[in-house]
Amino acid sequence: KGHALEGKTTFIDAAIGAELDPYTTVKFRPGQGNISTHTIGSVCSYPLMRVEEMYLIEAEAAAHTDGAKGAALLNTFMKTYRDANYNCTLSNSDEVVQEVVLQKRIELWGEGRSFFDIKRLNMSVTRAYEGTNVPQPVRYNTNGRPAWMNFVLPKFEGVYNTPVYNYNNPDPSGRYRPVK
């Protein structure tokens, strides 16, 4: 009780809302707003792609070649659709790309899109920090793109498909130790 998100998920019934753990969110509205009946509530629209994502992809692409143009596109999107007071004053390409990625993570939170940014941009992942809610056994920090994001083919795929036998991503098991 008393956490910042308490009572903010107004489209679910109060009895179920009271049972949710702190900081549990329901990003997409359940079918007919009914979270109690799984045959109704599970039927909901889950966007595979959103127009907001396209604006942010355009801003990032522009920032890779021209930081000022990327910042201008980001400002246009943010001021038009999110926060009229937002102002990105960066012009360095790398800094603008990082700002766009931050805004993508905020906009597309919970949709699994940061996975692709982390891989493509060779970003580090930091899960061990003061105040983290990541459970200790999986609290990993990386230096660069995490190996756990590489898909490893199952062993028997190579047995029955010999051309891929010697071509596989390295198995990341045991590569990382949790940070205490």
Q: What would you call each of these model-derived segments?
A:
Residues 1-180:
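Acidic/polar-rich alpha-helix caps and helix-coil junctions
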